[in-house]
Design a protein with these regions (language model features):
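N-terminal assembly/transducer modules of large multi-domain enzymes
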Residues: 2, 6-89, 145-150, 154-399
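Compositionally biased, low-complexity repeat tracts
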Residues: 26, 47, 95, 104-106, ...
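Short, flexible coil/linker segments at or flanking structured domains
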Residues: 51, 60-61, 92, 104, ...
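Alpha-helical hydrophobic/aromatic positions enriched in membrane-embedded helices and signal peptides
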Residues: 71, 98, 124-126
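Short beta-strand element(s) in the Bergerat
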Residues: 100-102, 185
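Flexible ATP-lid and adjacent glycine-rich G1/G2 motifs of the Bergerat
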Residues: 103-161
Length: 399
């Protein structure tokens, strides 16, 4: 296959054509030795290789990104979900196991070489994978750990390798053909350290532990003109998902235990795929948006607060006094430092059985003011001083 035939056979875009090399060019330039190429073909007898394309990643760069095998799988799966949602409006991906080989498959448009372009690819704002380089990092991370990765679409095969001939090692896509015709994209991961059962928690609607626990699923826009996407709250503790994809235990990623679990669409992770300290306030604001839209979620939320002792009617002063002292080591308690969801005060009152007396509740500053308010026929409510001023919609007591 000459160069013109090579470019046409793989529909190599003009932006990548200058970087791509035919098999003959790669051997002539010493990018691959004849023995390395022969070994590559022996290890993949189902494929016929015709050339290569550099990825522009070194092993050192991939190592600095601190990916894990699980994060790599997450990147593959979220790309599959994005593709199918873009095509059909509904996210879908399949995994299957053949011995030690794991397959991740979708019925999207089928991956093209443009996905391997240096600098990443353009993503829609609603997509799960919005940085554009996740697929390349996922594949090179696994290959750096001697886990072979091949991507298939149409009758094309994109096999990721680390060339031993290049100085310090360079990652390449080896371009090949297969006798099969593939619809969508299939990713083959040989010697996979994870099996398909391990992957179930990675996707919120795959996780059997969350089945039947949904309390709220609220669809809303990030900003005018953006698509409406769902954020959810679950009656299950301590899990965080972003755009259906698993981030981790809330106690680990947000450094606070959570009484409930959350799947937040319009919250963004850092480019490192982690939750950074500076973005934690945005996490609470996004949870607040879901709570503001869902009465059942507010009711459960307040019930959890009361069960944890954060909200109660206390008689420690010898009078009934509402006390709200959130535990800041919990997500649900710390939320009130940043926001008070719409309708939450009403939920407090309903949970405490004071709906008929809500107009008598007064916010007080200290114990003395609580006693005085009670003597005037009011129900005093004490709030922790660090809480958001949005709670000041509760009328203050005036003597």
């Amino acid at each position: 296959m000459n160069r013109k035939e090579f470019v046409e056979a793989f529909q190599i875009p003009e932006t990548l054509a200058a970087l791509a090399m035919t098999k003959e060019e790669a051997l002539e330039k010493g990018v691959f030795s004849a023995s390395s190429w022969e070994r590559l073909c022996e290890n993949n007898p189902d494929l016929t290789f015709h050339g290569i394309l550099p990825l522009g990643f070194s092993p050192e760069y991939v190592l600095r990104r601190e990916f894990s095998h699980m994060i790599a799988m997450r990147e593959f799966i979220q790309n599959a979900l994005d593709e199918t949602e873009l095509v059909s409006g509904k996210p879908s991906a399949q995994t299957r196991q053949e011995g030690n080989t794991l397959w991740i498959e979708d019925n999207g448009r089928g991956i093209t070489l443009d996905a391997f372009r240096m600098g990443g690819v353009t993503k829609e704002s609603w997509m799960r994978g919005y940085y554009g380089e996740g697929l390349k990092l996922a594949a090179t991370h696994l290959v750096a750990h001697q886990i072979p990765v091949t991507l298939f679409a149409r009758n094309d095969a994109y096999h990721i390798v680390l060339s031993p001939e290049t100085r310090q090692g360079t990652f390449f896509v080896v371009l090949g053909k297969t006798n099969s015709t593939i619809e969508g994209t299939k990713i083959r991961i040989k010697s996979s350290p994870l099996n398909r059962i391990d992957l179930l928690p990675l996707v919120r609607f795959w996780n059997p532990l969350l089945e039947g626990t949904t309390i709220a699923e609220e669809h809303y826009e990030d900003q005018p003109g953006s698509p409406s996407k769902p954020s959810c709250i679950f009656d299950y503790p301590n899990e965080l998902y972003v755009r259906n994809m698993y981030v981790g235990k809330m106690s680990k990623v947000a450094k606070r235990d959570a009484l409930l679990s959350y799947d937040l669409w319009w919250f963004r992770l850092d480019v490192t795929r982690t939750l950074q300290t500076a973005t934690v306030p945005l996490l609470f604001e996004e949870i607040s948006k879901v709570l503001s839209r869902s009465l059942p979620a507010r009711q459960l939320f307040v019930k959890k607060l009361r069960e944890a002792g954060m909200l109660k009617i206390s008689d420690r002063l010898g009078i009934p006094c509402i006390e709200f002292n959130p535990i800041f080591a919990t997500v649900e308690g710390h939320l009130f430092v940043y926001a008070c969801p719409a309708g939450m005060i009403d939920a407090f009152v309903d949970e405490l059985g004071l709906k008929d007396q809500q107009d008598k509740i007064r916010r007080v500053k200290d114990d003395d003011e609580a006693r005085l308010a009670h003597s005037k026929g009011f129900i005093p409510m004490q709030l922790h001083y660090e809480l958001t001023e949005e709670l000041h919609v509760i009328p203050a007591f005036t003597a």
